From Swiss-Prot:
InterPro entries: YcgL-like_sf, YcgL_dom
Cross-referenced Pfam families: YcgL
Protein name, as recorded: YcgL domain-containing protein APL_0712
All residue ranges annotated as the YcgL domain in the record: 6-90
Length: 97
């Protein structure tokens, strides 16, 4: 039994930590809008990833990434929202007052 592979190339942004760009083929950015390319900066290659493999992405669903690449030619993963340190502190110290 053979499983089809859907490899994608993953790049990180030098301008925004935690922002990643997924494209169908390595070094092919034709489908990425120019404005996004400018905002993203010069893509830094991270790895090739099999979207049909057993491994799952940490912050995005493999199926969503694959669908976006097939329909628009790329997938942009935004950085996670910043942690609210005050809220975390208050929750941890709730009963200590």
């Amino acid at each position: 039994m053979t499983m089809s592979t859907n490899l994608c190339a993953i790049y990180k942004s030098p301008k925004r930590e935690g922002m990643f760009l997924y494209v169908a083929k390595r070094d092919q950015f034709d489908s990425v809008p120019e404005a996004l390319r400018q905002m993203f900066g010069k893509p830094q290659f991270v790895m090739l990833f099999n979207l049909n493999g057993e491994k799952q992405l940490k912050r995005s669903k493999n199926e969503e990434v694959l669908q976006a690449i097939q329909t628009q030619g790329f997938f942009l993963q935004m950085p996670p929202p910043p942690e609210n340190l005050l809220k975390t502190f208050l929750e941890q110290n709730r009963g200590e007052a």
